Curated annotation (Swiss-Prot):
GO molecular function term, any single one: RNA polymerase II complex binding
Taxonomic placement: Eukaryota, Metazoa, Chordata, Craniata, Vertebrata
Functional summary from the UniProt entry: Acts as a linker between gene transcription and histone H2B monoubiquitination at 'Lys-120' (H2BK120ub1). Positive regulator of amino acid starvation-induced autophagy. Positively regulates MTOR activity. May negatively regulate the ubiquitin proteasome pathway.
Protein name: WW domain-containing adapter protein with coiled-coil
Protein encoded by which gene: wac
InterPro entries: WAC, WW_dom, WW_dom_sf
Organism, as annotated: Xenopus tropicalis (Western clawed frog)
Length: 628
């Protein structure tokens, strides 16, 4: 009789013995060949919760059953649904069907010139193929309709990839073909010129509204250029840049020059073509810059450099169509004088600010005005934003991004010892208020430079703003202030002398009115619906450090986010590989332990067997000795 040693229970090391899925097996073998999410129904890879290894797949996990279970209907049924939907003329609405019909929707939605083939056909034959991994680890492709398997990639997929490449190539820089943008722009320019020659003082609100609405459906895209690539309009407006390097004292007689290589009459007709490289004409741009150009002109009469925004280099002011305010300033550019350093004059920057704010409100843009007010804190930030407005065309007029940059720049108030503006808006009243809170004239700011040769601007421009009352009242206020400024003969007033009176200022420019001239030109016509907010107060500005938040603003934040996601992916992959290595090592060690256990059991059994034999031999010895 042989006694067996009782086998001890093995130590559990936290890993289950059987069905132990390793992470590298559960990593998705996602198909790189077709991006549509329809291949999830054919996905033979089990997700990480399914414990069975991929080569021992149960029948219920096969792609067809999986899809029928999850979607609740078979493939034929869903294909039938797609056909019905497409016959009705609509694309599918439920997200599941959307994902299966991805290619059809893609081709119909992108504004491509290629006709949408996939939306007309009943289904895409490429959807029948799915990609799988064989037990040997190689990829193979399976057609669920014909039940054919093959090693090489099916030709339907290759055709679909080719189609998608073409559509994406065309969709990058394409417009609907049914609109002739160049002809529209030329007609608009011609109409505006006729209108101006006949009636220079006022402009009918209907014309303005139709003009604005004509631009509103342009999708806020760049105007098409026939001779330049899509990147050209972005880089080339820099040629029309104002040179801030010149000294502020050398303000020349004329605000802007006609660039000799573009004759003015040619310019307006060339608007969407090659001349766009110099500066985009207002007719082809989005509404925001147009009104920007105009209102700036109306709000800073005092220093006649301001047709900077309204008269483009190479365009007389009379050729620029006013969109939201129809004041016309007869400024004639002198041909060969150099471009003035507009952006060096802080007074001018202060005066350009209200125009920007009024423009944003007139266009009903929901931009937070307080961010611009923060930007007004420093001269450098104002310079940068206005430099962008003056030099860049519609490409730079993604207003929200512009203002986020302004908010960043406003943080430089901590370094400058100038007291920042605190602009408060009374949300209940539509009029613009000016309140005397900070009336400390600073000595370190550049005083108002008298511009000696001012072009004759005698008539007060009429304001016909159809959009909103606030804008027009604020503009008349700023015009009165600039008129008073002119009558006083450009006395040097500090731009930081921001006097505000919490009651409405008297419309008659009296003798004491000059103290609040600069204030009114800088006061922002706040929209009544804009929520009341104020910029950094001087005490807070002392504690504000731009460097601490610079990394979470604007493009550095996007860059950091991309880096973080890339690092996260890498860490995940590395972790998976490391985990799989550790798992295999652990299994190896566990098998060694198992071998040792088996050897120990064998030894124990051998010892027991030998003891048994010893006992039997002793018995036999005793019997022998007894018999002897």
């Amino acid at each position: 009789m042989v006694m067996y040693a009782r086998k001890q229970a093995r130590l559990s090391d936290g890993c289950h013995d059987r069905r132990d899925s390793q992470p590298y097996q559960t990593l998705k073998y996602s198909s790189k060949s077709h991006p549509s999410s329809s291949d999830h129904r054919h996905d033979k890879m089990r997700d990480s919760t399914d414990p069975s290894p991929p080569n021992k797949m149960r029948r219920s996990n096969s792609p067809e059953n999986k899809y029928i279970d999850s979607a609740g209907h078979g493939k034929a049924k869903s294909m039938h649904l797609h056909r019905v939907r497409e016959r009705d003329g609509g694309t599918s609405f439920s997200p599941q069907e959307n994902s299966h019909n991805h290619s059809a929707i893609h081709s119909s939605n992108s504004h491509s010139s290629t006709p949408s083939k996939t939306s007309d056909s009943a289904y895409d034959p490429a959807d029948d193929w799915s990609e799988h991994i064989s037990s040997s680890g190689k990829k193979y492709y399976y057609n669920c309709r014909t039940e054919v398997s093959q090693w090489e990639k099916p030709k339907e997929w290759l055709e679909r990839e080719q189609r998608q490449k073409e559509t994406s190539k065309v969709a990058v820089n394409s417009f609907p073909k049914d609109r002739d943008y160049r002809r529209e722009a030329m007609q608009a320019a011609a109409a505006v010129e006729e209108k101006h020659s006949s009636d220079t003082s006022t402009m009918l609100p209907q014309n303005i509204l139709s003009q604005t609405s004509r631009h509103n459906d342009r999708d806020y895209r760049l105007p098409r250029t026939d001779s330049h690539s899509s990147a050209a309009p972005v880089q080339q407006p820099v040629k029309a840049a104002v040179h801030p390097a010149a000294a502020p004292s050398t303000v020349p007689s004329s605000p802007f020059t006609v660039q000799p290589d573009h004759p003015p009459p040619k310019k307006s007709y060339d608007a969407n073509g090659a001349a766009l490289s110099k500066l985009p004409t207002p007719t082809s741009s989005i509404p925001v810059p147009k009104s920007e150009r105009k209102e700036t002109a109306s709000s800073d009469k005092s220093s006649c450099t301001t047709p900077s925004t309204s008269s483009a280099p190479g365009l007389n002011l009379s050729a620029a169509p006013p969109s939201s305010s129809s004041s016309t300033v007869p400024v004639s550019p002198v041909p060969q004088s150099p471009i003035p350093p507009i952006l060096q004059d802080p007074n001018l920057l202060r005066q350009l600010l209200p125009a920007l704010q009024a423009t944003l409100q007139l266009n009903n843009s929901n931009v937070d005005i307080s961010k611009i007010n923060e930007a007004a804190v420093t001269q450098a930030s104002l310079q940068s934003i206005l430099h962008k407005i003056l030099t860049a065309g519609p490409s730079a007029f993604n207003i929200t991004s512009l203002i986020s940059q302004v908010a960043q720049l406003s943080a430089q108030a901590a370094q400058s010892n100038q007291s920042p503006m605190s602009l408060t808006s009374d949300a209940s009243s539509p009029r613009s208020y000016v309140s005397p809170r900070i009336s400390t004239p600073q000595t370190n700011t550049v005083p108002h430079k008298p511009l000696l040769s001012t072009p004759p601007v005698t008539s007060q421009p009429k304001v016909g703003t159809p959009g909103s009352k606030q804008g027009s009242s604020a503009q008349t206020a700023s015009q009165q202030s600039s008129a008073a400024d002119k009558s006083q003969g450009h006395e040097p007033t500090s731009p930081r002398n921001l006097q505000r009176s919490s009651s409405q200022r008297s419309p008659s420019p009296g003798p004491n009115h000059n103290s609040s001239t600069c204030a009114s030109s800088t006061s922002a016509p706040q929209n009544s619906s804009a929520r009341s907010s104020c910029s950094l107060t001087p005490t807070l500005a002392a504690y504000f450090n731009e460097n601490l938040v610079k990394h979470v603003q604007g493009w550095p934040a996007d860059h950091a986010e991309k880096q973080a996601s890339r690092l996260r992916e890498e860490a995940h992959n590395m972790g998976s590989i490391h985990m799989s290595e550790v798992c295999t090592e652990l299994k190896n060690l566990r098998s060694l332990v198992r071998v040792c256990e088996i050897q120990a059991t064998l030894r124990e059994q051998r010892i027991l067997f030998l003891r048994q034999q010893i006992k039997e031999l002793e018995k036999l010895k005793n019997q022998n000795s007894f018999m002897v």
